[in-house]
Design a protein with these regions (language model features):
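Periplasmic/cell-envelope proteins involved in peptidoglycan metabolism and beta-lactam response
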Residues: 1-68, 76-78, 87-89
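C-terminal soluble interaction/assembly domains
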Residues: 186-272
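Short, glycine/proline-biased beta-turn/loop segments that scaffold the active-site neighborhood
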Residues: 3-9, 119-125, 229
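Secretory-pathway/luminal and periplasmic proteins that interact with or process carbohydrate-rich
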Residues: 6-10, 152, 235-237
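Short Gly/Pro-enriched turn/cap motifs at secondary-structure boundaries
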Residues: 19-20, 102, 249-253
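A small/polar active-site loop signature that marks catalytic segments
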Residues: 63-222
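Extracytoplasmic
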Residues: 25-27, 34, 69, 78-82, ...
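A generic structural signal for nonpolar/aromatic side chains embedded in well-ordered alpha-helices
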Residues: 30, 143, 225-227
Length: 272
């Protein structure tokens, strides 16, 4: 996997101090558990539940008493897979926290029940084949409905590996801008797969052009199965009475909240 990996765990323009937030897991060539660990604590002093509950994370928990803390807080140390649990007096439910992926082999050891050894010898003439998991739309639907940054990043890297043979968001973005997106009204400034980067800039006219391109290539019926409808996904509690006529995706670009998608009028006219 490593020879194909030609990028970093964080994207260009990501906020480095968001490393502890669930919406910014590290990217990796072979993600495990979504590169996050889930911690659950019903009340102060109770047993901390882990998901996945494996010894790698069990030994990474460091419980601390903090008399000044009302709420229980969990903070991962910035450059280490150590999670400090600051005990407070208020109940704590469930949260997810990214872990550092450089120790992935240790996670695989626990999961696969195979001892990891640093010295690796490559076998010769073994059969090689690609194993496919979920159909494409089964990945894209939760990505769009949850606005899942991790899915978006890893999907772009998988596209890069499929098209270019390497995992590099910068190389695949450059390729797409020179091919599929070469005729956009304005050349976008595109930095990553999720939109976490503060460097991303797309004009509304370019969004409309991309939506038009997708509708012509894939058809509206397929897109309706992928995009959130009114009162669904990130549109929950919005456009409730118009749920059968709107399919769209929310997004934030450099501090501006946007909504891009499709609207079907009473006269059956499709608006982008």
């Amino acid at each position: 996997l490593l020879p194909n990996w030609q990028t970093t765990e964080y994207g260009s323009g990501w906020a480095w101090n968001d490393y502890n937030e669930s919406y910014m897991p590290e990217r990796s060539a072979l993600p495990i558990y979504g590169n996050v660990v889930e911690l659950k604590l019903q009340q102060a002093g109770s047993r901390l539940e882990l998901k996945p509950d494996i010894h790698f994370f069990r030994f990474a928990i460091n419980e601390l008493a903090d008399p000044l803390t009302q709420n229980i807080r969990v903070v991962r140390r910035q450059n280490k897979n150590t999670f400090d649990v600051l005990n407070g007096r208020q109940p704590y439910t469930t949260s997810q926290f990214p872990f550092m992926t450089y120790e992935n082999p240790r996670l695989l050891e626990d999961t696969l029940k195979i001892e990891w050894r640093e010295r690796v010898r490559f076998a010769q003439a073994l059969p090689f084949k690609t194993l496919h998991s979920q159909p494409t739309d089964s990945l894209l639907k939760p990505l769009m409905h949850r606005s899942d940054n991790f899915f978006a990043e890893q999907t772009l890297l998988m596209v890069s590996n499929k098209v270019l043979g390497v995992m590099s968001e910068s190389k695949i973005i450059d390729t797409i801008l020179k091919t599929d997106f070469k005729d956009l009204p304005q050349a976008p400034r595109w930095a990553d797969g999720s939109g976490l980067s503060r460097y991303n800039l797309f004009t509304p006219q370019s969004f409309v052009a991309i939506l038009d391109k997708m509708e012509k290539e894939f058809g509206l019926e397929r897109l309706k199965e992928i995009f959130p409808a009114g009162n669904d996904g990130t549109l929950r509690n919005y456009y409730v009475s118009d749920s059968a006529f709107i399919w769209a995706k929310t997004g934030t670009l450099s501090g501006v909240v946007a909504l891009s998608g499709y609207l079907l009028t009473k006269k059956e006219k499709l608006l982008l």
